[in-house]
A protein has these predicted regions:
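Positively charged n-region of N-terminal signal peptides that target proteins for export
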Residues: 1-6
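Bacterial N-terminal signal peptides
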Residues: 8-19
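Bacterial Sec-dependent signal peptides at the C-terminal "C-region" and cleavage site
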Residues: 19-25
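Central antiparallel beta-sheet cores of small beta-barrel/beta-sandwich binding domains
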Residues: 25-135, 141-159
């Protein structure tokens, strides 16, 4: 899998699951709707790093149990667009995603609890683990993976 595609898969999965713990009384996606932007750093297999810029747009279902997301990210060497659909049922997260310019997609699953969200993301020849936290209008994402893309740390804020 190419470096750009691996990065797109991991970063996109992380962003689509940026769930807010402060809205636990309703569905886990309540309060997430809108546009979020931010920056971070990606670590590659050879130890090098690249800065990345992202913009996520979230549409939340009426019961706040479903999320549709579009994510645009870019670094100095590539860009990508990811779309995702995520459902929450009793603290269990599941969904699908696709990267439109590379015609690839996969599944995701995980658990939410105590303000921490642990998610496994998969596609053919790619897996990643994500840890997510949201506090008010700020989101932090930490990603770990094997292969050409080793990980990322990204901070977002709501516009």
């Amino acid at each position: 899998m190419s470096r750009g595609l691996s990065t797109a898969c991991a970063v996109g999965a992380a962003m689509m699951l940026s769930v807010s713990a402060s809205y636990a009384g309703a569905g886990p996606f309540e309060g997430l709707a809108g546009v979020w932007t931010g920056r971070g750093t990606i670590q590659l297999e050879d130890g090098s790093t690249e800065k990345i810029r992202c913009k996520a747009t979230y549409a939340v279902s009426g019961d706040a149990q479903g999320l549709n997301q579009t994510l645009l990210c870019a670094s100095d060497s590539y860009k990508f667009e990811l779309k995702s659909n995520v459902l929450a049922q009793g603290g269990v997260l599941s969904g699908t995603w696709s990267e439109t310019s590379r015609n690839v997609g996969g599944t995701l699953g995980g658990r939410a609890g105590n303000g921490q969200f642990n998610v496994d993301v998969s596609a053919p020849a790619f897996t990643a683990k994500l840890k997510l936290t949201t506090n008010g209008n700020r989101q932090n994402v930490v990603i770990s993976s094997e292969g050409q893309f080793r990980g990322a740390s990204i901070s977002l804020s709501r516009s």
